[in-house]
């Protein structure tokens, strides 16, 4: 399915499923799936809560990656077509 294709795509680059990049990739896939679900089911508040939790987890991982390795962070942002973190 979709998850397996993304896993195989990521395994070509690196074999570590616990890496920050892989976790952000899997969270992004979950976010896209939940977003399409919520377009059909607008009043599904439990899914909205789950979406917010996943967004927060992804945001924390991206903040960690941007602090540790800015180059890998930029590559991942461009690869996944997501916006950069807001800096204060």
Swiss-Prot record:
GO terms for cellular component: chloroplast; ribonucleoprotein complex; ribosome. Its main location: plastid. Part of the 30S ribosomal subunit. The lineage of its organism: Eukaryota, Viridiplantae, Streptophyta, Embryophyta, Tracheophyta. It comes from Draba nemorosa. This is Small ribosomal subunit protein uS15c. Belongs to the universal ribosomal protein uS15 family. CDD domains: Ribosomal_S15p_S13e. It is found in: Plastid, Chloroplast.
